[in-house]
Design a protein with these regions (language model features):
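A conserved pocket-lining segment of Rossmann-fold NAD(P)-dependent short-chain dehydrogenase/reductase
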Residues: 87-105, 109, 127
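Conserved beta-loop-beta element that borders a ligand/cofactor-binding pocket
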Residues: 53-76
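Conserved active-site helix of classical SDR/Rossmann-fold NAD(P)-dependent CH-OH oxidoreductases
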Residues: 2, 45, 49-56, 112
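Conserved Rossmann-fold NAD(P)-dependent oxidoreductase catalytic core, especially the SDR/UDP-sugar
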Residues: 3-43, 58, 63-66
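Short linear elements at protein peripheries
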Residues: 104, 109, 172-193
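Structural signature of the Rossmann-like NAD(P)-dependent dehydrogenase/reductase core
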Residues: 17-18, 66-72, 103, 127
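Mid/C-terminal beta-alpha module of Rossmann-like enzyme folds, strongest
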Residues: 113-173
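Short-chain dehydrogenase/reductase
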Residues: 41-52, 72-75, 79, 103-105, ...
């Protein structure tokens, strides 16, 4: 680590912004905030937390470290979970009308948050998110609509969602409430962006 700090100082770097993930918390439901204890379950979440720990060890009075833990990122060209939702929206003839709340962030809003973090030389842990929560079924319906498809939402399918949430990780991931609290959504432990 000493070599890394020395190289950064010699290059005139005074801040590091690390894009981590909500995955460090290791949960698939519930409200979260920057004070929630990380307990990653996946290799992805574990690797993000290890990187956070290594990078924050570089923090000192002349070197700011901002760790951003965004929720699912959506927008053109996004991969991962958002791409899975796009595929479902394209092929599903109907979808459950099941209410849930999720934190998400658009690529544009995340880019703006990163810029603001750099512009203010913010230091700390941040959980950026869009101003409004998202409901999975409404999002899938909207994605279908963007592709010229009318996707009916049916409450009669909701018992299947309850079973899927109880017995499958995919069901919990898609339909559980998983969100950052609004009071803590964009605030850091060591500062604000």
């Amino acid at each position: 680590m000493f070599f890394s700090v020395y190289v950064l100082e010699e290059a005139g770097v005074h801040q590091f912004v690390f894009l981590s993930s909500m995955s460090v918390y290791g949960v698939d439901q519930g409200p979260l905030d920057p004070m929630t204890t990380p307990e990653p379950k996946s290799n992805y979440g574990k690797s993000k937390l290890q990187a956070e720990e290594g990078i924050t060890a570089l923090r000192d009075e002349s070197f700011a470290v901002a760790v951003l833990r965004p929720p699912m990122v959506y927008g053109p060209g996004c991969k991962g979970n958002y791409r899975s939702l796009q595929k479902i929206a394209k092929i599903a003839p109907v979808f459950p009308d099941y209410e849930n709340i999720r934190s998400m962030i658009s690529m544009e809003n995340l880019a703006d948050f990163v810029k603001q973090t750099l512009d203010t030389r913010a230091d700390g842990l941040f959980c950026p998110q869009d101003p409004e929560y998202v409901c999975t079924c409404r999002m899938i319906r909207d994605i279908a609509g963007e592709n010229g498809k009318n996707l009916p939402l049916l409450k009669v399918l909701n018992p299947a969602v309850v079973l899927a949430k109880k017995f499958t990780g995919m069901g919990r991931k898609a339909f559980s409430d998983l969100y950052y609290t609004k009071s803590q959504g964009n605030e850091g432990q060591n500062g604000e962006a």
